[in-house]
Amino acid sequence: MRATVLCFSGLDPSGGAGLQADIEAIGQSGAHAAIACTALTVQNSQQVFGFEATSKELLLAQAHAVVGDLPIKAVKSGMLGTTDNIAALAEFLREHPEYKYVLDPVLVANSGGSLGDQATLVKAFVELIPLADIITPNTVELRALTGLDDLDTATQKLFEMGAKAI
């Protein structure tokens, strides 16, 4: 059986990001994508109208159901949406240190729409940084996570916060 990557992310009904994009990218790499849906978004390719986050309990139930059935080798997270979901993912990762973890600290949609309270999420993401094997922030996320404008300085700060690879 192919290796499985468990993706924690939101559902974008336009299919341009989130779980759909993860499923396609992981499939193209030859692995199987399993999902734990963190939120249902209301968006199209131009705008985010809102979202409803999955409860922490439901999120963990999805993840544990998949772990009991499929050969998980790695975890990838995108939109988490709430501090409860960030805490739930951190709990899950501590239970499963054998999984490689890719953190994409999503704060806004590609269209620029908010996917949660940015200041609150940034504070919570600090818990995930040292758990990640690689972090893939864009420049907006890198600046938000570190509070620094200069990209070289911000990258160094992210390493100081516990990042292993960026």
PLM segments and residue spans:
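Small-residue (G/A/S/T)-rich helix-start motifs and N-terminal tracts that mark the onset
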Residues: 1-74, 146-166
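Hydrophobic faces of well-ordered beta-strands that scaffold small-molecule active sites
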Residues: 33, 101-103, 135, 166
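A short, flexible beta-alpha/helix-coil linker loop
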Residues: 42-43, 107-109, 142
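Glycine/small-residue-rich loop that forms an oxyanion/phosphate-binding "nest" at active or ligand-binding sites
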Residues: 62-127, 137
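Conserved phosphate/ATP/ADP-binding segment of small-molecule kinases
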Residues: 118-166
